[in-house]
């Protein structure tokens, strides 16, 4: 009798579990179909270009910057930006951040963080919860980025809509705050080709999808771009065309070494972080980075593995050239090649 009843209970539980799974899948499918049939509003390329016709004014003082992202932000790179800004005379530069491990803008917004990874990524002293930080109205610039693979993020995590939510949230509490989307990169092992994706994704995905959707909201205004991916592509082409430089032979030398002796395809070492920090500095402050220090400190106070003087010089030259060639950075445009 008990065995028979147990079987009936087990069968019912399986039935309910199956029904629950079907219901969950049905909801997910419904959301997907709704998004496919009701795409978000987007700005045309002409409307986006019009937003960037007038450059931003260079900041007159050190900026308070808030960074939202994942491991391609990390605890070290924002600190490099602060040190470089201070070396350039902006003593008041400071920052806070909230990071996740491969976290999307949607997951940050909904606070859907796996506890272990969220705690691991935010042990640094500059952590401050994102919603609290933006509501405080204590920041001059808000820099945010999306997870990669970017195509998956756009399709499954509604990148443009959540970029718009974050931007509108920041604007609500600080109308004059400068907003920046930090363009990152995919792994060097990506099937479509690393340089091809870097050079194609800026217009197609970062600007043409994420920003076009985000800036279609009337409460967002202009979001500028920190073009780290474009700089990385240009730097790698320049570096490899010269056959490498002291301390850096090719693109792979920008990425961390894994325990098995192979290079991580996406996470930067100190040299790569320095390059990305230069892009942030130049975009945020309109500063010519040439001649700035290349020996910096990590977030834990230890000395970073500095690029050689030759590598640092090429990085600085490429950053200054590329950032001034893209209207979305907010800098006055220079159509020359590497001039002063």
Show where each model-derived region lies:
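Structured segments of extracytoplasmic/periplasmic soluble domains
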Residues: 71, 75, 80-91, 145, ...
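Acidic/histidine-rich, surface-exposed loop or edge segments in extracytoplasmic proteins
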Residues: 59-67, 140-151, 301
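Serine-esterase "nucleophile elbow" of acetyl-processing enzymes
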Residues: 37-102
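N-terminal Sec-pathway targeting helices
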Residues: 6-24
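Alpha-helical cap/lid subdomain in secreted, periplasmic
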Residues: 128-270, 282
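Conserved catalytic region of serine esterases and O-acyltransferases that act on ester linkages
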Residues: 32-34, 249-340
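Conserved SGNH/GDSL esterase-like catalytic core that processes O-acyl groups on lipids
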Residues: 75-161
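Hydrophobic alpha-helical membrane-insertion segments, chiefly the h-region
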Residues: 24-34
């Amino acid at each position: 009798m008990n065995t028979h009843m147990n079987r009936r209970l087990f069968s019912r539980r399986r039935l309910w579990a199956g029904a629950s799974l079907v219901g969950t899948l049905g909801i997910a499918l419904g959301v997907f179909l709704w998004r496919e049939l009701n795409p978000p509003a987007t700005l045309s390329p002409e409307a986006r270009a019009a937003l960037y016709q007038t450059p931003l004014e260079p900041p007159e003082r050190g900026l308070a910057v808030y960074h939202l992202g994942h491991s391609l932000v990390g605890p070290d790179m924002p600190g490099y930006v602060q040190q470089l800004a201070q070396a350039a005379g902006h003593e008041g530069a400071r920052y806070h951040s909230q990071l996740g491990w491969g976290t999307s803008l949607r997951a940050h917004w909904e606070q859907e963080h796996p506890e272990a990874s969220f705690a691991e990524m935010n042990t640094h002293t500059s952590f401050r919860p994102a919603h609290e930080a933006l509501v405080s109205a204590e920041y001059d610039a808000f820099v945010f980025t999306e997870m990669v693979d970017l195509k998956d993020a756009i399709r499954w995590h509604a990148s443009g809509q959540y970029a718009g939510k974050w931007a509108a949230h920041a604007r609500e509490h600080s109308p004059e705050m400068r907003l920046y989307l930090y363009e990152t990169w995919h792994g060097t092992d990506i099937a479509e080709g690393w340089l091809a994706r870097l050079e194609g994704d800026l217009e197609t995905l970062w600007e043409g999808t994420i920003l076009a959707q985000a800036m279609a909201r009337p409460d967002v205004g202009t979001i500028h771009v920190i073009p780290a991916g474009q700089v990385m592509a240009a730097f790698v082409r320049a570096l490899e065309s010269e056959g490498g430089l002291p301390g850096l032979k090719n693109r792979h030398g920008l990425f961390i070494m894994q325990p098995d002796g192979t290079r991580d395809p996406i996470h930067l070492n100190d040299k790569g972080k320095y390059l990305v920090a230069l892009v942030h500095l130049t975009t945020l402050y309109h500063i010519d980075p040439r001649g700035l220090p290349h020996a910096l400190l990590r977030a834990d106070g230890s000395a970073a593995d500095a690029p050689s003087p030759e590598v640092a010089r090429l990085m600085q030259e490429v950053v200054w050239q590329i950032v001034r060639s893209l209207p979305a950075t907010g800098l006055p445009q220079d159509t020359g090649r590497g001039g002063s």
